[in-house]
Amino acid sequence: MEDTVYKNLEDAAKLYGPSELADNPELRKEEVLSVLKKLDLESVKGSKCSSLSGGQKKKLTIAMEYITRPEILFMDEPDSGVDGSMVMEVMTTLREITDEGKILCVITHTPDRIRHLFDKVMVVGKSSEGCGRLCYFGSVDNALKVFAAQSLEEIVHKISGAENAALVDQYVQWFENERRGGHAG
């Protein structure tokens, strides 16, 4: 038997949330209802998860992480599987979460779609060693200058693929030098 939206969120709070949520059913219920409201999922709280739209499923995933009260939320492709009309709603919710002081770490290959979420960007590329290396961390505007790019997606294109490993190595070296000198970002 499949659980409802409410039950999934309640279980996340009980299993992964702070002890005060796990140990206090009344507080947990209050928190679940609050998060359902924040993520605009109140109208589907009694629905089975399989009946949700792609955007609602994405919001439930966010809600299940958010209710655990993390300092950092990790989102892998938060705009994938979400139709155009719902993308903005999901992204606005994520921006509101960051405005609360939470750190949002987003992994995306289409950063320009959600650029308004970013205060800073971290660019990681695959080096000649075959591993992910930090090429840049700082403001979006400065990233565009450093990579001589018109868009964030152009940066992704520049550092993607094995054929670009030597270029990634150059950016890694640049970033390490800048970091030592205190000029990056």
Model-derived regions: residue spans:
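Topological signature of polytopic alpha-helical transporters
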Residues: D11, Y16, E20-E31, K45, ...
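ABC ATPase C-loop
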Residues: E65-Y66
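Conserved catalytic motifs of ABC-family nucleotide-binding domains
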Residues: R69
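Catalytic Walker B motif of ABC-type/P-loop ATPase nucleotide-binding domains
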Residues: L73-D76
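Conserved ABC ATPase signature
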Residues: K48-L52
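ABC transporter NBD signature
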Residues: T4, S53
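H-loop/switch region of ABC-family ATPase nucleotide-binding domains
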Residues: I107-H109
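Helical segment within the ABC ATPase nucleotide-binding domain
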Residues: V87-E100
